[in-house]
Amino acid sequence: MTIKLLSESTINRIAAGEVIERPASVVKELVENAVDAGSTKIDIILERAGKNLIIISDDGVGMTDKELEIAVERHTTSKLDETDFLNIHTFGFRGEALPSIAAISKMLITSKKRDNQKAFQIKLIGGDEKQIAPAIHNEGTKIEIRDLFFATPARLKFLRTDKTELAATVDVVKKIALAHPEISFSLTHDGKTLLKLKGQNKDAENNLKQRIIDVIGEDFIKNASYIDFKSPDFSIYGYTSIPTYNRASSEDQFLFINNRPVKDKLLQVALRVAYQDYMPRDRYPLCAIFLQIDPQLVDVNVHPAKAEVRFHDPNYVRNLLIDSIKNALSNKSHIASTTIASSAIELFKNPFVNKEPAISKPLNVNSKPSEYRPATSPTVPKYTPNNSCQKLIDTLPHARIEQEVEQRIQNEPQKSSQYRLGAAKAQLHTTYVISQTEDSIVITDQHAAHERLGYEKIKNYIKNEELIKQRLLIPEIVELPDEKRADILYENKDKLSKLGLSLEKFGEKSIIVTEIPNILGDINVQKLIQDLADHLAECGENIALTELIEHVTETYACHYSIRAGRKLSADEMNALLRQMENTPFSGQCNHGRPTYIELKLKDIERLFGRK
């Protein structure tokens, strides 16, 4: 076959394959064009999730008839300065979107330039048969896309259901709307309004806050910390959820570079690392985080879809984002999710409140007690400890922990108003500490709370290299199931040494342990080493020190803590509460579960119909 030059329409259809994957891709490109045009109002109308019809209307700068004619040609744009290709401030700059969309659909563009008397429209079918004519239109541009992919029917077979395609489009509009709270957006599907967002004219932070409430929800703002970092060539701002307010997927994570929505692995990993000490591995935080960076320090021209970026100094960006998130979380590190308490309130709502008043029956002291049925607890992330953790529970010393908690704070009773978590009043089922503040009661899970306290303490010991080793009087020989586990432990002996464990190879399948961390006291060395060997075997040979530290610290803290079922004195309960108030991230244990919930007095009064 001889080499030949492809036709312009064929080239455009090939380009469309990279840029336009589904109706959501069309909406993204056209809405971004509307934003670049300086619009203050953008309306989107869809039929059959955009498969039949997509209409994008804006009140932007508009186009003349001459501009309309060349706008649908490849690589024509008003947004790129050829002398400064790296200094890109707009969404679009490649000049590919309109001709690519036109090549696979029936397109009609109507536009009127600002301050011009006349409007014009251009009609294209499959990118050909261009027809320009006068029209009647307000200032701005309206683009109609009909029968998407009619020119490439094979692509239609790969589209999902209308519901799935619509969800993708809604997600695209939400992301762009979050980045531009000053613009009004509406999205209508088959005659039904799905989104109606009013443009804000307040200060920048309040604009963003209100738009986040409209898009993600007010609950998110109530359970989020504000991020605020500034430097000469870099800034990070936005909101990120506290650890106990999380989701089972990452769908509600919105990340932006210079107001451009991105799915960047570097940023996603940084977000994960920032939360790794405070959230289960199968849960995800919610966030709307904006990074503003000098355009010359980031490359957005990696792919035509422009969802991926490259940083000039990726490690700098990664570390800066991690530190910014951690600093923001530390401002609310003692707070547990407000939705947990709300869920609890809903469970106990009296069905007769606000209806006919129910008459309480007098108590019959001679009647037999009815069977006790515990109330269903609110849903929280489920944590299943590993077998080795449970096996080690009974082997660990509690004397050191008890001695620490039993330190007397004051001889006189503590006042509820003195402390954020209040004064301890009772212990429920030898598991939960009940305390009272001025306007609420607080229920604390004693094991989860002390587990977080222990985790932070051990983590600081390791970070500051203050973990003291205790030499065993008689070295412990641990026999492992196979030679592989013994080899992996020995290969990581230097890393384990930094965690307070000194060991050597002793035969093919055995390890001899000579030193352990002093903080653990009389621990069952056999079970600890077997647990570590199993973990290293799962992770492979090249486990990072940070990952090893995380696993070992969690294991230490799990057994370090006060167990459920242990009776505490009033002073012990108050000591635990005071330590929580002075320990970062005490609102959740290191598995992401809440350590306490707070029930406001006004909510309790509502339960009894008082308010």
From Swiss-Prot:
**What superkingdom heads the lineage?**
Bacteria
Q: What Gene Ontology cellular-component terms does the record carry?
A: mismatch repair complex
Which parts of the chain are coiled coil?
Answer: none
Q: Indicate yes or no for the key word rRNA-binding.
A: no
Q: Which PROSITE patterns match?
A: DNA_MISMATCH_REPAIR_1
Q: Which GO terms describe its molecular function?
A: ATP binding; ATP hydrolysis activity; ATP-dependent DNA damage sensor activity; mismatched DNA binding
Q: Which SUPFAM superfamilies does the entry mention?
A: ATPase domain of HSP90 chaperone/DNA topoisomerase II/histidine kinase (SSF55874), DNA mismatch repair protein MutL (SSF118116), Ribosomal protein S5 domain 2-like (SSF54211)
Q: Which InterPro entries match?
A: DNA_mismatch_repair_CS (IPR014762), DNA_mismatch_repair_MutL (IPR020667), DNA_mismatch_S5_2-like (IPR013507), HATPase_C_sf (IPR036890), MutL/Mlh/PMS (IPR002099), MutL/Mlh/Pms-like (IPR038973), MutL_C (IPR014790), MutL_C_dimsub (IPR042120)
List this protein's GO terms for biological process.
Answer: mismatch repair
Among its keywords, does the record have DNA damage? yes
**Keywords on this record?**
DNA damage, DNA repair
**Any idea what job this protein has?**
This protein is involved in the repair of mismatches in DNA. It is required for dam-dependent methyl-directed DNA mismatch repair. May act as a 'molecular matchmaker', a protein that promotes the formation of a stable complex between two or more DNA-binding proteins in an ATP-dependent manner without itself being part of a final effector complex.
Q: Which family does it belong to?
A: Belongs to the DNA mismatch repair MutL/HexB family.
Protein name according to UniProt: DNA mismatch repair protein MutL
Native source organism of the sequence: Rickettsia bellii (strain RML369-C)
**Which gene carries the instructions for this protein?**
mutL
